[in-house]
Amino acid sequence: MTQGPGGRAPPAPPAPPEPEAPTTFCALLPRMPQWKFAAPGGFLGRGPAAARAAGASGGADPQPEPAGPGGVPALAAAVLGACEPRCAAPCPLPALSRCRGAGSRGSRGGRGAAGSGDAAAAAEWIRKGSFIHKPAHGWLHPDARVLGPGVSYVVRYMGCIEVLRSMRSLDFNTRTQVTREAINRLHEAVPGVRGSWKKKAPNKALASVLGKSNLRFAGMSISIHISTDGLSLSVPATRQVIANHHMPSISFASGGDTDMTDYVAYVAKDPINQRACHILECCEGLAQSIISTVGQAFELRFKQYLHSPPKVALPPERLAGPEESAWGDEEDSLEHNYYNSIPGKEPPLGGLVDSRLALTQPCALTALDQGPSPSLRDACSLPWDVGSTGTAPPGDGYVQADARGPPDHEEHLYVNTQGLDAPEPEDSPKKDLFDMRPFEDALKLHECSVAAGVTAAPLPLEDQWPSPPTRRAPVAPTEEQLRQEPWYHGRMSRRAAERMLRADGDFLVRDSVTNPGQYVLTGMHAGQPKHLLLVDPEGVVRTKDVLFESISHLIDHHLQNGQPIVAAESELHLRGVVSREP
């Protein structure tokens, strides 16, 4: 032994730390002796992998390693779920992922490289794991059959009873009582019942939960088809579907218990019976098989949900800013926030389209919203209903001779239609491009004048030759005429027009990008851009109360007189001209 300069032996090097033994997550829990379990046999057992391993080793269960000072009873380990004593893979379920993920790492030194096996372990659980208490012998059918064609059973349909309250608002015991009370009510109502059932007094507490009964198809032998899509009840001979319940519409299922060994009851919603409890009578031992198959279908459907959960709907990325409109550009949408529009207000009758050759309004609106396409043209090419009258309701699939045709302009809603909406006198001729009455009246007048030998002074020309009704105002000016005005900017989008406004009273006139020939007045009022249509569907330039000869006449009138344009309880002053760029 070598001594140092001071005669003392050098200190021995520290011993390396002992590696920590693998510890399950169960051993990290403190003892909880106050926990008492009345029926530990009903807990979830170990996974199928451990069961097969135990069977291969002679049927004896492997003994878990003795827990350290912080051990936990074996019953508490069973509560943690269907894991082996030493968990092999994390479970993708949210409630069990943390505990099983911690136990699967084995030691602290291996936690860094454990993330690579998470995906494979999760996929393995989705394929073999279970969160429903399986029968001792496992599921009755292969997963591929329940996922694919499904499983069918022949049972006897007992009818259904309306359930007035949502099953989510009831606890588990109340749900079970609801199904038993439904069986109790239908047991004597259906003749020829063969299943064993002990008649009980009606449960008055459930009077507000159960409603009327539907005994149609009651007592018939039917087929119940079970798959991950749902449950379907049908008559085997005629293949008539009694009920078809998708898996999300099924809220509760019960059956095969000690007091209802021959019956299966489940609560589901459908368009005919709404929320109802359907009762099935089964032969001996079949009720447990049906409930087990339903549980297998539920488990596989939930695993599909875990494997591909629905996408979360994200909010729109952009919101309406100070310089952009609330509905985007005109190229993006046909709905505009014109301030002289009122919901439900229709444009005046008339236009340059023959209403007898047009379709009804719903078809026209669809064509405007989605644009012309071969499918829409085929859908709208309906035969004429010669015998139909104007009293038929609109949109009944037939063309009405007096229906209003689709306008050849943007579908805007006007408020300044008092004059055009006023009823015309009964003797006023109706506007019709193909109306031949004015010419017939003129010929009759000429023939009468010749036959009577009229020698008096000739009548004015307009009285001798009646003409069809004319417009109330001139047609809107052409593009060449508007190009001479400094406030006209030609074809421009709403956003570009709004960006050119600086102060209240600034205005310009533009041509619509979506529908050329539709002229829009864009101005600034109270810091907000406003849009006003200047030409109505009949081609008349006007405001709410005044008709004008042209757009230039309208602008000059309000600009020189300082009068605001009033519409829809708002007003727009024209003070500053926004000149177009040269």
Swiss-Prot record:
Residues 147-329 form the PID domain. Expressed in brain. Expressed at high level in the hypothalamus and at low level in the caudate nucleus. Residues 1-24, 47-70, 460-481 are annotated as: Disordered. One of its GO terms (biological process) is intracellular signal transduction. The modification Phosphotyrosine is found at residues 338-339, 414. SUPFAM superfamilies: PH domain-like, SH2 domain. PROSITE patterns: PID, SH2. SMART domains: PTB (SM00462), SH2 (SM00252). Phosphorylated on tyrosines by the Trk receptors. The keyword Ubl conjugation does not apply. GO terms for molecular function: receptor tyrosine kinase binding. Residues 8-20 have a biased composition (Pro residues). It holds the Pfam family PID. Keywords: Phosphoprotein, SH2 domain. Signaling adapter that couples activated growth factor receptors to signaling pathway in neurons. Involved in the signal transduction pathways of neurotrophin-activated Trk receptors in cortical neurons. Interacts with the Trk receptors in a phosphotyrosine-dependent manner and MEGF12. Once activated, binds to GRB2. PubMed:15057824 has shown that SHC2 is poorly phosphorylated by the Trk receptors, in opposite to PubMed:12006576. This is SHC-transforming protein 2. It comes from Homo sapiens.
